[in-house]
Amino acid sequence: MRNLIKNVFRSFRTAKIALIALTFLIFVAVGSFVLLNNTVNNFNASFQHVTEQGQLSNAIINERYDFGKLEFQKTSNDATSSAQPSVSTRSTLTAQKANGANSSFTLTLTPDSRTSFINNALQLKPDVYNSLVTVTFSYGSESDQTKKTQIEEQSKLIAANNLSRALQTDKELLVTGQLEQLKATFRTYKAINITDQGVFKKLIASEPTDQVNRLVLFDGHQLARSRQVEFNELFSQFTQVQAKGKDQLSTTLKNGNYEQLLQAIANNFGSSETELLKEIQDALKQTNSSTTLAQTQSSQQFSKLKNLFDSGSTFTNIAGKLTLQWMEGTNKKQLVIFDPSSYETVVAPGNWSYEQQQGKAVYQDINHWNRIKRLPFNEFEREFQKIDKRYKMLVDKIEYLILGVGITPDFVYPVFSESLLIPNTANEQLYYVNQTGYERTASSFLTNPTETGIVARLPNLNHDLDVINQWAVKNMSWPPNLKAAYSNTDTTNILNLLAARTVFIPNLINTISLVSSFLTIAILLVAIFVTILILVSYLKKNTEQIGILKANGVSGRKINLSLLIFSLIPGIVGSFIGYTLGISMQNVAINLFSNYWFIPTQTSSFSVLGLLFFALLVVLMMSGISLFVGWLILRQDVVKILKHDSEFKVSHLGLWAKWLFAKFGIMTRFRVALAFNAPWKLVFLTLMSALTMMILNLSFATKDAFQVAQTKTTLTQSNHQYEFELASPTEQSGLLKWQLFAELGATDDRTTDAVKLANRRMEIQSVDESKKWKNQQVINFVTDATGFSNDINYLENIVQSKIGLDYSLGFGNVSSNPWKLSETLMPANQASASNTAFQNFLKAIIVIDPNEGGKYIKQTKDEVTVRFLYEIDSSKALKNGNTKSVNKIQKSTAAPQAQQGQSNQLMLDNDFAKFLYKQFNLIKEGGKADPVDLNNFDFANQNQIKRFYSKYNALPPVDYKLAFNVIGLPKETIANQKDAPLFGFLTLQAQLGNDAIKIKGIKDWKLDNTNLGPVLRTNEDEIINQRLFSKPNGIIINSSAAKKYRLKEGSQLHVKIHNGYKRVNAKLVNQDPTLTATFNIVGINNSVHEPEFYTSYKTAATLLQYPNEWIEKQLPFNSFYANSILPFTQSTSLFSESGLFPGTSSFAANNTVLTEVIKKTIEGGKTNSKTDVQKRAAQATANGKYNSSQNNKMNYERLQKALGITSDLDSSKAGEYATILERVYDGLPYNSTISFISNVQANDALFANIANTTQQIQTAAIGIIIPIIMLIVLLVSTTLIQELKKIAIRLKALGYSNPKILLSFLSIYLPLFIFGLLISIPISIYLIALHNQVIFSSAAILLEATLNFPTVILSMLVLSGVLSITFVLNWLELNKIKIAKEIKNS
């Protein structure tokens, strides 16, 4: 046995290449598996740790309740007290039940304020809510009519507030009650987004008691529990005590449970307040005694404690602390009850490495921190400032102490917002604070975007979601087609950011695991083949020795066991190196995924057991293969083994090949015989060579394919950066109105023969400048202050902004703030943007003109952030007026006291209105600025505002516009046109087979540098736009569309169109609204990214069924090209498909507000004849005022049109009409006008990312495959030549030189190249086509990679270079041969 083993070891010299190759393959297989498998396991362990410890939610619920207007009307118990109330300031009033009819009055919730939510509350809890919707108040001893009116107005506010508070806190009415019944665990999720010096910071509220999505720590200490609940209770207690009056303080404290409040006040007073502290201590002692405080000797002088609850004292619950301010004589005093835990934060691990680079560290001295937290507020602040800055983080000027590093499971993949879907830890920072910590910052950034919702763990997810959604249909105000509750993995819901945050990580782990398994199996299969090759080669080379051994009685089993060395040594060495390297490379692998992985991950440590396991596994597998192959060969009889061993045996294929070359010389026939002598090895080697050339061909052919494709795609764009897709008009909506963005809200000039569009302009005659601003930018004083929620069309065609709307206006018996309702109709992020823009606007005004701006704008310095907050000074912006014209308008409906001149009107001051118009004009001038200056403007940068004003004598577009059926366009889009924007076009929403496509109807633009539309080119670079305008129903498609749908020039395209102008008419009568169209393909554009379709504007407009006179003037449009994003970032345009703009958020049959509005619209439309309306309108115009009643007839007609009913409407069928609106308009009164924006730069970047990612994957794959295949080719070819060594010795003895001998041996490469080429070329063509198809299917990029002659030659040269290594190795081997010795040994 020893001799057998020695013989095997001696053969290592001749099989060293094979052994190295086998060791290398085992090393790669084990190393790859260990590395990737451990990475997957480590990732999965970290992810599971966070999700299990943090209790990841499985559902999200978005709350939206319709409390309605909460408007109360008076039902008088006193015949003498029927005066029309006027607007008065909000003040505290004690509501009491009346003792007599003459001293009381009753307020009842108006019918159109009784939303379905309130009606549900009345059904569920009538005892509670009947007393809240009908409330009796007392005038007390007041007899003055003006004072009574003020009491009535204040009482309305109190009644509304009481009802609102009850509705918002009643769990039985809210979804939280449903969740409790379902035994779900849940919590409220709150986050605020803040941009701080170019860094996007997100603060998330988190409590240690959270049961869902709780904070999981990796380092440091947990956040302390906040005192927010306690603060809310203290605030409520103080309000109750103060409302009952300081004179009743003794009785109030005795009868109520206010010990918590008194103790909290006492705990936060300094020792200097000895008298006050003594009074509080006495109060605490007496609260449980039978005597009142007034009866005790110690409390007879009770002035100090009473001062705290005086009507002039204030108690605020802001910024995470309670602040009590009161007066003692002329001295103003202050007490702060604060929560020191509001200064704590935990940093997300994804940001922590970056923070550490900036020198930040976790504060570890928790005992010192706990001591500081026990100090009074002022001392705490001083001690807090002494802590080193390296332990703190800043949000603006607000400091937090870094206590730890941690994450909640919903932010494992930290997607920050809809626009920030790719995490960037340097510029996007995530911090956790408790509830008071959250309030501490949120109170200083009230206008910033926030995320809110309920996150829950539902026991039976699908069932519970159905239950909640069915409940929400009846109790929430979402449109019927939107779900309030959905799974956290529901990627179809665009609002579900949690899906983007949690679904990605499991997908990433599964992908890595799949790649690991595939790669390991592939490499192991190659290793098995190499093992077989080595064994077969060894056994054949040592046939004689094996035969002699068997003849001498050595068993085949022993011989076979000796062969195990061939698998044992490579297996052990390869496994050891592979396992060691795989373990050591874990951090490298984790870092490779650093763009996707943001939580700390522990790596697996080196394990002797792990090493032994992998070594044993590989050895067993390779040994099994070795034993099996050896058994197959060694089972032959000894005679057969020794027979003809010394002869060169030519295979049948070799003999047949020799016969084909019978007429050639002997050496030629000899070389042919050599080439075909080992058919199976030749076949395998040929396949490997073909595979090598195929992969090389693919690599070379696709090398620049992406760059070429991107170049072609970029050529289709000409100058524009953005493509906006808008809502498509209907007959009910009318055409979209457009304006220059900077002039949005102004009256623009139109030609006299222009078709009247959907906009109507409202006159404001009282201010001269308003003649230029009629659409209107500033509210029409009376119109929006009277019955604004009772008009079905109250928002129609009005351009608004917060600066022109945010005023509480009074007229007659109505007080309203138009902005409040407009804000509720905006998406939350746009409402926040509007509030932010409002601050920037006021700041800009102050910056460019401090004197004039200071007249109307108040600046308040935030003590925490040291930032200025700006607001309009209402005392200077508004005026009270008793105008004769207003009284005349009211006479027909006003009460007798109103006719006596008791009516007050609160309106904008004329000088202030002129001041606003001046600012709008400055913005209008700013619209003429260079687009570069506009697009790159930092609205919060004071110096940039100054520079802009100095350069253009104008303001940038700082005012955020809210428009209805109106869209602001950049000047380059309009291009000096009057009736239609030059670079506006029509998009047909079409269906081709089962695919949704977009066909763009473009105009015949002049194709020069000012053109913003596409320049369509063929592969020969011929511009073919004009073909659209010279042939009927012509369409140009791009190369991608031609490939995907197998189309060509001359083919026809049959589609269905879904956005026709008359589509609603069809839906109203339950007909199919789709239109059919047939196009003739007149050209193929060379763009290769995603299918594109272009037709002429006229063809598109005709197919969409717009009137011919509109088409001739090119008035309709639903898309446009631009170089500016401002129409989206600095404005909100809402579109109503129905043409209706009611003051409610949904069309639904159970929407009480909607049905009331429909009733009033029908009743108003029937009672106002056309003559009466004209008379009222003429009177209103003459007086410079506008009364909403003149809208009634128009509103009635628009409602008829929206419903598709030409006969008279019946107010008793309001519910039926609401059902029609819900069905036809999908439950949505309005939607965003802008439905899609295509960013050329973003598309190019996406294209580049896809290209780079694909190329990297391709390079990595080829980088692994090519070396392995070439190693096999080298191994097999070397083995083949080694087997011919005996022949080489004989040829050398016959006098042949080494080069001639080698050339003879290299003849085996001839069929390899010939057959390799024959196989590789067609398969390469197929592979390249398959590669193109895969990229096209997955990324919608059409690559035109093809196989050409230079590519084939280059691949052959590379393969020849690899095979030349064999030539060199054998040259060296032949030079070492000593003929006499070799003949003797043989």
Curated annotation (Swiss-Prot):
Disulfide partners: none
Residue spans crossing the bilayer: 17-37, 402-422, 494-514, 518-538, 563-583, 592-612, 613-633, 682-702, 1261-1281, 1310-1330, 1349-1369
Primary location recorded for the protein, binned into one broad class: membrane
Tagged with keyword Membrane: yes
Membrane-protein topology: Multi-pass membrane protein
Coiled coil regions in record: none
Keyword Transmembrane applies: yes
Subcellular localization, as worded in the UniProt entry: Cell membrane
Molecular function, one GO term: transmembrane transporter activity
Similarity field: Belongs to the ABC-4 integral membrane protein family.
Protein name: Uncharacterized ABC transporter permease MG064 homolog
